[in-house]
Amino acid sequence: MALDKSVIPLPLLVVVLLVLGWAQPSLGGESQAEKFQRQHMDSGSSPSSSSTYCNQMMKLRNMTQGWCKSVNTFVHEPLVDVQNVCFQEKVTCKNGQTNCFKSNSKMHITECRLTNGSKYPNCAYQTSPKERHIIVACEGSPYVPVHFDDSVEDST
């Protein structure tokens, strides 16, 4: 009789674990492509020289929760133009991987750098609007940007 009591919860446990496994991605898990867009895309605006742009955007895009991200770049171009970089000039990533691509043309970006002495929870950023070639790492099917690797002044 004790055996019967232990057998009933096991299938229930299996069902619960399966449901949690299927539901997990929809419970806030974000793909690398979605994370790239959240952290780097700001298509609806122009590069800003406003000293508050980076402070506001870094907080709004959840990059100051628990710590201050030291550097981040926002791209002010249509998403499709940034996605098309994945089919442009292939370059080696800073970490040595070979899935990086450099934009053929310069793009409008804003670079955010943590100011000296700034510490969590009071993250303060210097805002620098620029026009540069961007380098992104691409993966997946469809092939899309998943990591902002760098920006460079010229195309060489």
From Swiss-Prot:
One of its GO terms (biological process) is defense response to Gram-positive bacterium. Its EC number is 4.6.1.18. Keywords: Disulfide bond, Endonuclease, Glycoprotein, Hydrolase, Lyase, Nuclease, Secreted, Signal. It comes from the Eukaryota. Disulfide bonds join C54-C112, C68-C123, C86-C138, C93-C100. GO terms for cellular component: extracellular region. It catalyses: an [RNA] containing cytidine + H2O = an [RNA]-3'-cytidine-3'-phosphate + a 5'-hydroxy-ribonucleotide-3'-[RNA]; an [RNA] containing uridine + H2O = an [RNA]-3'-uridine-3'-phosphate + a 5'-hydroxy-ribonucleotide-3'-[RNA]. The keyword Lyase applies. It is found in: Secreted. Glycans are attached at N62, N116. Residues 1-28 form the signal peptide. Gene3D superfamilies: Ribonuclease A-like domain (3.10.130.10). The active site is at H40, H147. One of its GO terms (molecular function) is nucleic acid binding. PROSITE patterns: RNASE_PANCREATIC (PS00127). Substrate binds at K35, R38, K69, S70, V71, N72, T73, K94, R113. Belongs to the pancreatic ribonuclease family. Endonuclease that catalyzes the cleavage of RNA on the 3' side of pyrimidine nucleotides. Compared to RNASE1 it has lost activity towards dsRNA. Monomer. This is Ribonuclease 1B pancreatic.
